[in-house]
């Protein structure tokens, strides 16, 4: 089965073609970073309009590059969670193509796509495992027994980790997107200068909270600010380093706790923040001490992309899942409500 995957949940337009026998044939990604940079964050209306402009030429080029014209068996598109306007662009486009081509179409859960992205690698993880889904909109620990067999172990009670990264970056006047810029600045910082809190690590449970850490960062920036309203460059780097270390520490502690609680020895990290080099280093070191392994997708598949949607959709279609013709999108959609296959 050859599946065209379409991702438009936020500010990236991703398309890909996955073949159940040959694997990933090709993928293309257009990022809207330049569109939203001047606003310091994603503007939903601009995101939707840009998806409309980019989808057709991206799909057209991909069909040619992969020799897939008239060879697509099904279409998978992100149907939630995400920005409703952006989701509708991809859903309408995908459903329209499916009707024109006379093939089935299926809506895919965005976070299931992220969770399954490491399956695209040469050495994928095997079920069961614990997944850390960590992005701008989600921070969740999930026990995964198979596709659709998900048990939520813990989640953020307020800000997601990626959202906290972006907000901390804004406090230091760093460009959008903030997460990668915080990580870059942190490499120049002194990790021993500031000690930031590790929220909710001193109590049982697997939930997260990053709002207090965000406030602590804001107060530290204000305390050391000069006449420009910001601390000097080195202090900003030290704050970025301390902030990143606090987030990474918190995630590592909770991941170890989740593995011990479930008695599993495999961890998958997925979502945009999983591309963070420091997080990967710390998790690999921590899990090696307890004879556990960590898996993640290549960096280009950590952020939103069409490949993960094509793969996830293909697995559900092969299992016989079918959907009505109605176009349904869900801006909010709990992962553990998905049907098992």
From Swiss-Prot:
Substrate binds at residues 133-137, 166, 179, 276. InterPro entries: ATPase_NBD, Gcp-like_dom, KAE1/TsaD, Peptidase_M22_CS, TsaD. GO terms for cellular component: cytoplasm. Fe cation binds at residues 110, 114, 304. It comes from the Bacteria. Keywords: Acyltransferase, Cytoplasm, Iron, Metal-binding, Transferase, tRNA processing. It catalyses: L-threonylcarbamoyladenylate + adenosine(37) in tRNA = N(6)-L-threonylcarbamoyladenosine(37) in tRNA + AMP + H(+). GO terms for biological process: tRNA threonylcarbamoyladenosine modification. Binds 1 Fe(2+) ion per subunit. Gene3D superfamilies: 3.30.420.40. It is an enzyme of class 2 (transferase). It is found in: Cytoplasm. Belongs to the KAE1 / TsaD family. This is tRNA N6-adenosine threonylcarbamoyltransferase. It comes from Saccharophagus degradans (strain 2-40 / ATCC 43961 / DSM 17024).
């Amino acid at each position: 089965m050859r599946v065209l995957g379409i991702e438009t949940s936020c500010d990236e337009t991703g398309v890909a073609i996955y073949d159940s026998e040959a694997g990933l044939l090709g993928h293309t990604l257009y990022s809207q970073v330049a569109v939203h940079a001047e606003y310091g964050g994603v503007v939903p209306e601009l995101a939707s309009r840009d998806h409309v402009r980019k989808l057709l030429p991206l799909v057209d080029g991909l069909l040619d590059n992969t020799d897939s014209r008239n060879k697509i068996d099904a279409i998978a598109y992100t149907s939630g969670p995400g920005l409703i306007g952006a989701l509708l662009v991809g859903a309408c486009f995908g459903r329209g193509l499916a009707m024109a081509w006379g093939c089935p179409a299926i809506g895919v859960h965005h976070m299931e796509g992220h969770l399954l992205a490491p399956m695209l690698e040469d050495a994928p993880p095997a079920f069961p495992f614990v997944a850390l889904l960590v992005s701008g909109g989600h921070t969740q620990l999930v026990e995964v027994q198979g596709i659709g067999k998900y048990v939520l172990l813990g989640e953020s009670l307020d800000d997601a980790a990626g959202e906290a990264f972006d907000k901390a970056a804004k406090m230091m006047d760093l460009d959008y997107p903030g997460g990668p810029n915080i990580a870059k600045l942190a490499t120049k910082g002194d990790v021993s200068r500031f000690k930031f809190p590790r929220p909710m690590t001193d109590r049982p449970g697997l939930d997260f909270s990053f709002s207090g850490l965000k406030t602590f960062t804001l107060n530290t920036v204000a305390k050391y600010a000069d006449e420009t309203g910001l601390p000097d460059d080195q202090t900003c780097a030290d704050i970025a380093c301390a902030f990143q270390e606090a987030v990474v520490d918190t995630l590592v502690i909770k991941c170890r706790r989740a593995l011990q609680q479930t008695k599993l020895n495999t961890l998958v990290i997925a979502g945009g923040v999983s591309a963070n080099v420091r997080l990967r280093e710390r998790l690999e070191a921590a899990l090696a001490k307890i004879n556990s392994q960590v898996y993640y997708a290549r960096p280009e598949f950590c952020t939103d992309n069409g490949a993960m949607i094509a793969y996830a959709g293909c697995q559900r279609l092969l299992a016989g899942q079918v959907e009505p013709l109605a176009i349904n999108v869900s801006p909010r959609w709990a992962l553990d409500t998905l049907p098992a296959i």
